[in-house]
């Protein structure tokens, strides 16, 4: 079941890739993918290329994939291990969701952080109290780690 579904998603991604994103298997292992997300225009991540790993559980799509950034990023919902605080990767997962939709959700999280549900409270605090400084630090990290 999982393998068939993953193969279908891979085909769909090839036919209709989401904007600013790409993903595919690492070698022959269809349960382990690498993805890239281009820093969205008009965001402090613009111009950066961010790499992520995707691990599919054997009971996919009934359980969510494990998705993590391997590129460092300054963001209130993404910690230094690359873990992402995103409801659809946890409690709000649904088998109707696809990797394409997950990547688009992560892209929109880059444009619109959720400082009220932070993984990194300090970054969330700066985001809420000093947006200029947040944008500057996010740009610096993007230049340092993602270019």
UniProtKB/Swiss-Prot annotation:
Changing residue 61 to S: In ns770; Viable. Inappropriate survival of male gonadal linker cell; exacerbated on a heat shock transcription factor hsf-1 mutant background. Catalyzes the covalent attachment of ubiquitin to other proteins. Mediates the selective degradation of short-lived and abnormal proteins. Plays a role in the DNA damage response. In particular, in response to ionizing radiation, associates with the E3 ubiquitin-protein ligase brc-1-brd-1 heterodimer on chromatin to activate E3-ubiquitin ligase activity of the heterodimer, and thus its DNA damage repair mechanisms. Disruption phenotype: RNAi-mediated knockdown results in reduced ubiquitination at DNA damage sites. Inappropriate survival of male gonadal linker cell. Interacts with the brc-1-brd-1 heterodimer following ionizing irradiation. It catalyses: S-ubiquitinyl-[E1 ubiquitin-activating enzyme]-L-cysteine + [E2 ubiquitin-conjugating enzyme]-L-cysteine = [E1 ubiquitin-activating enzyme]-L-cysteine + S-ubiquitinyl-[E2 ubiquitin-conjugating enzyme]-L-cysteine. Residues 1-147 form the UBC core domain. Pfam families: UQ_con. Pathway: Protein modification; protein ubiquitination. InterPro entries: UBQ-conjugat_E2_core, UBQ-conjugating_AS, UBQ-conjugating_enzyme/RWD. One of its GO terms (biological process) is protein polyubiquitination. Gene3D superfamilies: Ubiquitin Conjugating Enzyme. It comes from the Eukaryota. This is Ubiquitin-conjugating enzyme E2 2. It is found in: Nucleus; Chromosome; Cytoplasm. Keywords: ATP-binding, Chromosome, Cytoplasm, Nucleotide-binding, Nucleus, Transferase, Ubl conjugation pathway. The keyword Nucleotide-binding applies. PANTHER family: UBIQUITIN-CONJUGATING ENZYME E2. Belongs to the ubiquitin-conjugating enzyme family. GO terms for cellular component: chromosome; cytoplasm; nucleus. One of its GO terms (molecular function) is ubiquitin-protein transferase activity. The keyword Nucleotide-binding applies. It comes from Caenorhabditis elegans. Its EC number is 2.3.2.23. The lineage of its organism: Eukaryota, Metazoa, Ecdysozoa, Nematoda, Chromadorea. The active site is at residue 85. Expressed in the nervous system.
